[in-house]
């Protein structure tokens, strides 16, 4: 839309099945004032979309030969056919954009008018059309009408369901134009593109903006091809860039890109993608090279790095005289002085790094479908193959400072990591390797020999390095310390510990997309999906998924309440309940919502409140399948809809089962815990 001094554009009568006009676009830019509509009192075109399913009791004589869908009314059938043919007969008279349905065109016109007449009564956000408002309301109601047929998970919006279903189908429609890697989510592709640390050689001759990729430049140049003469609209500008900057001050309310999670609307796709990252726990592509911290955007990273002040630097470099905060930072710096600098390549994007710490921090940005790789010798787990290969070399010969083997075999094919070639194959199991030395190391697995024995407990190991690592469990020596919090451990546990600081969770659940720091956590979590309950109660026969839950359950038989309040003498079975109770005496509300700032005295209340923002509905009615955000709503539903009046809901667990038992012509119900 351009700033234009002319008569209001009047759409031909009955163009859209109405005699009303769209809000006109008479605007004055000569003084740089904000745009204002001259006929704001005109009625807004509210779009009412009729659902053909309302006439569910009538016949549907119109059948689509392409997909078999049936329709009651011929106009709906004809509109549907256009979706298959790709026809778009309804064009916008302002920007020439075309649509298959008239209703979509009417919705689109609100982009040009800037009006948002539909307000949310819960949070005062406004929207251009009724459909956007209805989608947004699901944030408050928690409604999730779109269910995945594969796993039963529900979603508030169809586009989110479509995105989720790709995790089942494996479809990856978004490809990187630089390296060909494919992704199931557009957001992951955008994050991946940032890993191509390239210069920006592609210059826009119109505005001087530079781009890393030619394709991005070509896409950008389209905005210049639609620019009218710079002096046409009154105010003049020296170049197109300044005109675009000027026009942006008048289009602040025209934001056609809605967030499907919270309903907020943005001016362009980049702003939308940046915002959507705040809703996820996904990868954070900006690692701090000083302390393993990883951040969502460059601004957060720079703010964090300012905490590494000059006053905290006490370790001097013998080469340059510079001082550093910790040993990790000093070693990273010193590696830049050596002539035999080790370039460790990233197998995902080809980037090279000075040391293993930098490489590990970088590789945490490649979280798309990471698969844990175990070392066959000692069981240590790694997140990528290059890291595993580097580790395996420590089982065969002395390693360099960075743990990279320097035998002649390992220098035969320096480009193998980039080509993916694995020329050395095991004749026993067919497994292939990059290096001959790693193959030799692997062959020991098939011999079964374990010549290294622990004199303390008699345990045997294939390699001496594994034995030394094991012996530290007897001596108490912890040779490796975390340079962030001074915790000590063996190297394998130290790597696990670093994930506390980096936030890396390389073990994904294939059932529900949750991720975990440790393999043991993932295995424990799987019991939720399998229903395995290996810990039975000897008193009542009830079984539990985890031993800790069984211990808590046993207190219901013994009556043990070990946690006592010193203020009022009240006792509690569980420590979290005791700690929550203490806040009733202090009046403190230590739990605050990061979304709206509301404070709560108890964590469970905060967690329940969060569901209002996330739309989560974990409580399901076993009678009709309806889901609810809060347990109290489920109880009310059982009573008012199904006539069920449970005697008590005394449990403090998250989930509730209502078991229906048939007794002749009647039914009885029993409320139980879901472990």
Curated annotation (Swiss-Prot):
Superkingdom field: Eukaryota
Keyword Transport: no
Short name of one Pfam family: zf-C2H2
Entry keyword Membrane: no
Residue ranges, compositional bias (Basic and acidic residues): 408-421
Family matches, as SMART domains: ZnF_C2H2
GO MF entry, a single one: zinc ion binding
GO BP term, pick one: regulation of DNA-templated transcription
Record key words, sorted: DNA-binding, Metal-binding, Nucleus, Repeat, Transcription, Transcription regulation, Zinc, Zinc-finger
Biased composition (Polar residues): 304-325, 390-407
Recorded GO CC terms: nucleus
InterPro entries named among the record's database cross-references: Znf_C2H2_sf (IPR036236), Znf_C2H2_type (IPR013087)
Zinc finger motifs (C2H2-type), residue ranges: 62-84, 90-112, 118-140, 146-168, 174-196, 202-224, 257-279, 286-308, 344-366, 373-395, 424-446, 452-474, 480-501, 507-529, 535-557, 563-585, 591-613, 619-642
Stretch list, region Disordered: 302-325, 390-423
Compartments it resides in: Nucleus
Main location: nucleus
Annotated function: May be involved in transcriptional regulation.
Similarity comment: Belongs to the krueppel C2H2-type zinc-finger protein family.
Name of the protein: Gastrula zinc finger protein xFG20-1
């Amino acid at each position: 839309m351009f700033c234009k001094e002319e008569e209001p554009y009047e759409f031909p009568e009955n163009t859209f099945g109405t005699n009303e006009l769209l809000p006109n676009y008479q605007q004055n830019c000569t003084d740089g004032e904000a745009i204002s509509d001259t006929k704001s009192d005109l009625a807004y075109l509210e779009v009412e979309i009729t659902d053909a399913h309302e006439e569910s009791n009538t016949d549907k004589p119109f059948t689509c030969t392409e997909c078999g869908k049936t329709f009651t009314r011929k106009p709906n059938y004809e509109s549907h056919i256009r979706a298959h043919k790709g026809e778009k007969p309804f064009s916008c008279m302002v920007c020439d954009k075309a649509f298959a349905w008239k209703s979509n065109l009417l919705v689109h016109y609100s982009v040009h008018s800037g009006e948002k007449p539909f307000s949310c009564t819960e949070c005062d956000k406004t929207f251009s059309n009724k459909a956007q408002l209805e989608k947004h309301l699901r944030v408050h109601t928690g409604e999730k009408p779109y269910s995945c047929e594969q796993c039963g998970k529900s979603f508030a919006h169809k586009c989110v369901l479509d995105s989720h279903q790709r995790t089942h189908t494996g479809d990856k429609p978004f490809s990187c134009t630089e390296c060909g890697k494919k992704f199931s989510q557009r957001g992951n592709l955008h994050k991946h593109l940032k890993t191509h640390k390239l210069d920006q050689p592609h210059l826009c001759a119109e505005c001087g903006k530079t781009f890393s990729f030619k394709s991005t430049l070509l896409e950008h140049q389209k905005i210049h091809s639609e620019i009218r003469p710079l002096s046409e609209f009154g105010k003049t500008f020296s170049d197109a860039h300044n005109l675009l900057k000027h026009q942006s001050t008048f289009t602040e309310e025209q934001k056609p890109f809605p967030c499907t999670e919270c309903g907020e609307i943005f001016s362009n796709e980049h702003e939308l993608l940046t915002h959507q990252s705040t809703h996820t726990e996904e990868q954070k592509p900006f690692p701090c090279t000083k302390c393993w911290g990883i951040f969502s955007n460059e601004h957060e990273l720079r703010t964090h790095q300012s905490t590494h002040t000059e006053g905290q630097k006490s370790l001097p470099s013998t080469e340059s005289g510079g001082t550093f905060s910790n040993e990790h930072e000093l070693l990273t710096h010193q590696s830049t002085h050596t002539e035999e600098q080790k370039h460790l390549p990233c197998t995902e994007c080809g980037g090279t790094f000075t040391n293993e710490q930098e490489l590990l921090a970088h590789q945490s940005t490649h979280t798309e479908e990471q698969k844990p790789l175990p070392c066959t010798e000692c069981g240590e787990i790694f997140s990528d193959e290059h890291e595993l290969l580097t580790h395996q070399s420590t089982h065969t010969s002395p390693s360099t400072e960075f743990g990279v083997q320097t035998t002649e075999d390992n220098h035969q094919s320096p480009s193998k990591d980039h080509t993916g070639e694995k020329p050395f194959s095991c004749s026993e199991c067919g497994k292939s390797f990059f290096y001959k030395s790693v193959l030799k190391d692997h062959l020991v697995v098939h011999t079964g020999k374990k010549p290294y024995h622990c004199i303390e407990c008699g345990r045997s190991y294939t390699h001496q390095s594994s034995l030394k690592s094991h012996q530290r469990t007897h001596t108490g020596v912890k040779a490796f310390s975390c340079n962030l919090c001074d915790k000590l451990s063996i190297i394998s546990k130290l790597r696990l510990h670093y994930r506390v600081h980096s936030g890396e969770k390389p073990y994904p659940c294939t059932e529900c997309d949750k991720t975990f720091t440790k393999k043991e956590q993932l295995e424990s979590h799987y019991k939720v999906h399998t229903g395995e309950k290996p810990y039975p109660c000897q008193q009542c026969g009830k079984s539990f998924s985890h031993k800790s839950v069984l211990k808590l359950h046993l207190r219901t038989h013994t009556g043990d309440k070990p946690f006592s309040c010193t203020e009022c003498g009240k006792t509690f079975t569980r420590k979290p309940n005791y700690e929550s109770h203490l806040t009733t005496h202090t009046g403190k509300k230590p739990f605050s919502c990061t979304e709206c700032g509301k404070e709560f005295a108890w964590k469970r209340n905060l967690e329940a409140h969060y569901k209002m923002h996330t739309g989560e509905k974990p409580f399901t009615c076993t009678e009709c399948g309806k889901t609810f955000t809060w347990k109290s709503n489920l109880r009310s539903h059982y009573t008012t809809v199904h006539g069920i009046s449970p005697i008590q809901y005394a449990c403090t667990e998250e989930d509730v089962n209502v078991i229906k038992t048939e007794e002749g012509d009647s039914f009885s119900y029993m409320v139980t815990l879901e472990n």
